[in-house]
Amino acid sequence: MAVYRLCVTTGSYLKAGTLDNIYATLVGTCGESPKQKLDRVGRDFATGSVQKYKVRCASELGEILLLRLHKERFAFFCKDPWYCSRICVTTPDGSVVHFPCYQWIDGYCTVELRPGTARTICQDALPLLLDHRKRELQARQECYRWKIYAPGFPRMVDVSSFEEMESDKKFALTKTAPCADQDDNSGNRYLPGFPMKVDIPSLLHMEPNIRYSATKTASLIFNALPASLGMKIRGLLDRKGSWKRLDDIRNIFWCHKTFTSEYVTEHWCEDSFFGYQYLNGVNPIMLHCLSSLPSKLPVTNDMVAPLLGPGTCLQTELERGHIFLADYWILAEAPVHCLNGRQQYVTAPLCLLWLNPQGVLLPLAIQLSQIPGPESPIFLPTDCELDWLLAKTWVRNSEFLVHENNTHFLCTHLLCEAFSMATLRQLPLCHPVYKLLLPHTRYTLQVNTIARATLLNPDGLVDKVTSIGRRGLIYLMSTGLAHFTYTDFCLPDSLRARGVLTIPNYHYRDDGLKIWAAIERFVSEIVSYYYPNDACVQQDSELQAWVGEIFAQAFLGRESSGFPSRLCTPGELVKYLTAIIFNCSAQHAAVNSGQHDFGAWMPNAPSSMRQPPPQTKGNTTMESYLETLPEVNTTCSNLLLFWLVSQEPKDQRPLGTYPDEHFTEEAPRQSIAAFQKCLAQISKDIRARNESLALPYAYLDPPLIENSVSI
C-alpha cells in the first residue's frame, strides 16, 4: 500500500471555499490512483484553509504527471464555486510535487493539473501530456473567443461567449459575433446617479477567472457612487451653459484635491509648466526633436527672436537639437460631435518648443491647423496674454484627445487585452511564458469590458464629454493603430527615435528606462533558463502560435508595423516580453495614474471646445474664453471619469509582486527575488530624488505601479 499525502490550500477571496465534494485522482507513469474523496472531520475547503488528506494506492505510481480534481454535488446544495490556490503532493519516498492552481473551479467538473515545473511543448514527449496540452488549449479557445469591435481596431474578447458557457458544456469556437455597430443596444440604459448610459448585459457575464474580486468590485463602486451622486445632488451633472468664472471649477471636487492637482491649478497658465507636461505629464511621448522645420509650420527667426534672446537664432537652436515639435496631425480629419445639442470643434495643432539654456522646455509657437495661411495664424508668447492662453488651451484639448484615445486606451488597454487573450488561448498553464505573463494580464479583460460598457457604448461617457464622440474615437484609434510601430512600443527605441535622450528633468524617461532595464534583466534570466538556444525558440510551436496570434489579432497582420509574427532567437523573445510587461504595468501607470492630478483643473485638459479656433489675433476676452471651454455638465462628467480611473481600487498587486506561485523551480524563484530587490532600489532612488523637486514625479515608483492594466 502506497500513501500519498495531499496538502490543499483554498484561496482567501470572499466565498473562495466550497461545500461541494472534492475528489482527487493521481496519475503517474506507472498507473493512476482510485478516485478518492478528500474528506476529514469538520468543514473541508473553507476560505483560506490549508488542509491535509491521504490518497492510498495499491502500489506506487512512479513519476506524478497529473492531478485530477473532481468537483461534485454535496447533498441537496446548489453548486458552489471553489478557488483552489495550490496542492502539494508528498510521495511515499518523501519528495514533494507542487501543483499550482490559482483558479476558480465552477460547477461540477473535472480539472487536470500538471506539476508546477514549467515545460515547453518540445520538452513533453509522453502522449498523455501532449494530449493534455492540446485539450487545455482547445477548451480555452472555446471559452475566450475573439470579436471585432470596429474596423481597424485590435480584436477584443467576446463576452457573450461567457454567457453561453456552462462549466460542463462548451460551445463551438467558430460561432461568429457581430461588430460593435451591429450590437443590440436594448440593454444600454441610464442608471440612477450616472450621467451616461451603461451597457448592462455585457457586465453580467464574466468568466470567474478574469473578473474582478469582490474586494475590487466593492472598492470601485465605493469610489464611483459617492462622487457621482454628490455631483447629481448639487445639480452639476445636469447644469448646461458656460462657467461664469474660472474659480468656480475649483469647487467641483473640493474634497478630492491632491498636491499635484493644486499645483496644476496654480501654475497651469505658465509656459514653463506647459512645457513640463510634455515631459512628465500624462502624455509624455509626444515630443520629437527637429533638425529642420516642417514646411507646414513656417515659423521665422524674427517671430521667436524675442524669446530666444541675443547670441542665438532659430537655426542655431535647431542645429543644437534644442527645438522640439508636438504634432497632432491625427486630429486633422477626426469626425466632430455635438454636446448638449451644440456643435463642437477640433483642431490639429502644431506646437513648437524650445529647450532654453536653463534646461526649461518652453512653447515657442503654436499653429492651430496643419495648413498654414492667413486664416491659421501662428500664435507666439509675445502675443496678447489671452490669445496665447487660448492657443495653449487648444493644444491641451488636442493633448486630451490623443492621450485618452491613443496613448492611454489604445496602446495600453486594448493592446494589453490582445496580449491577454493570446496568452490564454495559445499557451497552456505549464508553459513558462504563460507563467511569466499571467500576473500582468490580471483583470485586464474585466476592466476593458467595463470601459466598453460605460465609455465606448452609444451615449456612453465618450459621447457625453468629448468633442469627437464615439465615431471620432473609433477613427482616432483605428488611424493610430495603422501608424503604431514596434519602435513606438519599445521605450528605449522610442526615446532614441524621437531624439529625447538628453533633455534634462525628463523623469518619465529616466524612471522608465530603469524599470525597463529591471524587467529586461528579469525576463532575460527566465528566458535563458527555459530557452538556452535559438532552436528552443524556433521549435516551440505554442510560442510561435502565440506570437502569430498577437500579430494577426492585435496588429491586424500589418507588416509595416514592425511587430514580429515569428520569433527566432532568445534575444528577440526577451525584448518582446520586456515590452509587453512594461506596457502592461509601468507604461499604463505613467499615462493613467495622473489623470485626476493633471485634469482636475479642467482648463488644463478640456475634453471639448465649443467655439471654432481663432483665425485672427487680438479678439480673445475672458468671456469668449469661457464660452470656448466645455459646459458645466460636460466638465463634471469628465472629471468624474478622471477621479475614478486615478483611484486604483483595492486588491492591488504592485509591479514584481507575485503572491500566486506559478513558478516552482528554484532558478526562476531566485530571479523573482532579484527583480523585487532591484525594484525596491529604484523606488528608493525615485523617492530620494522627489524630495528635492517642487513637483514630485511618482507615477513610476514601483510600489505605485500595478502589475497589470486593471483600472
Curated annotation (Swiss-Prot):
Cofactor, free-text remark: Binds 1 Fe cation per subunit.
Pathway info: Lipid metabolism; hydroperoxy eicosatetraenoic acid biosynthesis; Lipid metabolism; sphingolipid metabolism
UniProt GO MF annotations: hydroperoxy icosatetraenoate dehydratase activity; hydroperoxy icosatetraenoate isomerase activity; intramolecular hydroxytransferase activity; iron ion binding; oxidoreductase activity, acting on single donors with incorporation of molecular oxygen, incorporation of two atoms of oxygen
Domain Lipoxygenase per the UniProt entry, residue ranges: 119-711
Cofactor: Fe cation
InterPro entries in the record: LipOase, LipOase_C, LipOase_C_sf, LipOase_CS, LipOase_Fe_BS, LipOase_mml, PLAT/LH2_dom, PLAT/LH2_dom_sf
PROSITE patterns referenced in this protein's UniProt entry, alphabetically: LIPOXYGENASE_1, LIPOXYGENASE_2, LIPOXYGENASE_3, PLAT
Biological process (GO), any one: fat cell differentiation
PLAT domain sequence ranges: 2-119
RNA-binding keyword on record: no
Cellular localization per UniProt: Cytoplasm
EC number(s) reported in the record: 4.2.1.152, 5.4.4.7
Matching SUPFAM superfamilies: Lipase/lipooxygenase domain (PLAT/LH2 domain), Lipoxigenase
Cellular component terms (Gene Ontology): cytoplasm; membrane
Catalytic activity: a hydroperoxyeicosatetraenoate = a hydroxy-epoxy-eicosatetraenoate; a hydroperoxyeicosatetraenoate = an oxoeicosatetraenoate + H2O; (12R)-hydroperoxy-(5Z,8Z,10E,14Z)-eicosatetraenoate = (8R)-hydroxy-(11R,12R)-epoxy-(5Z,9E,14Z)-eicosatrienoate; (12S)-hydroperoxy-(5Z,8Z,10E,14Z)-eicosatetraenoate = (8R)-hydroxy-(11S,12S)-epoxy-(5Z,9E,14Z)-eicosatrienoate
Keyword annotations: Cytoplasm, Dioxygenase, Fatty acid metabolism, Iron, Isomerase, Lipid metabolism, Lyase, Metal-binding, Oxidoreductase
Function in brief: Non-heme iron-containing lipoxygenase which is atypical in that it displays a prominent hydroperoxide isomerase activity and a reduced lipoxygenases activity. The hydroperoxide isomerase activity catalyzes the isomerization of hydroperoxides, derived from arachidonic and linoleic acid by ALOX12B, into hepoxilin-type epoxyalcohols and ketones. In presence of oxygen, oxygenates polyunsaturated fatty acids, including arachidonic acid, to produce fatty acid hydroperoxides.
Name used for this protein in its record: Hydroperoxide isomerase ALOXE3
Source species of the chain: Rattus norvegicus (Rat)
